């Protein structure tokens, strides 16, 4: 279906998506923002990233999608938080869709590999978290051997009530491989 790939705003595509959602029995829908978004960037790249994320949020709202997941990007955590909140304002989002910041594997200047950093990003904001198990494993959280320990660490840092989506996937790399 076109709308799932290109997120067209045409009334026919929106109606087709909504019909598909209804046929699914009301399961929550989650979309992933563009992988090119870098909310930690500076200057023009940051502005373009915020605008792209705002556009994704607007499309998600039009479609009735509950969650939009975004990678925080590389750079300063303060810029990530500022960019995410600005995108929500630009899109006019009040409650839905909920913007979820996905944890990362880390490496370089990537933001969001540590649960404590995610906790800071979402504190005192409407932002929430999407846990990606592959990224967590690559960042050093042993989801394969001690998954309950990882969930406990996430709960202590962020609070599981702020983690409505888990992206369960495998990793070809080793524990902590980034």
Task: Pin down the residues of each PLM region.
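Non-cysteine beta-strand/loop elements that form the S-adenosyl-L-methionine
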Residues: 1, 27-31, 127-133, 160-172
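N-terminal pre-domain/capping segments
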Residues: 1-33, 39-55
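Active-site beta-loop-alpha junctions enriched in small/polar residues
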Residues: 1-2, 34-36, 73-75, 102-106, ...
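Acidic-enriched, low-complexity/disordered segments with a strong bias for Aspartate over Glutamate
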Residues: 2, 55-56, 124, 132, ...
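Gly/Pro-rich active-site loop or hairpin
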Residues: 8, 40, 111-119, 137-178
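Short amphipathic alpha-helices and their capping/turn segments at secondary-structure boundaries
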Residues: 10-25, 54-59, 85-89, 114-124, ...
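Short, basic/glycine-rich phosphate-binding loops at helix/coil junctions
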Residues: 29, 99, 173-177
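Active-site acidic/histidine proton-transfer and metal-coordination neighborhood
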Residues: 38-131
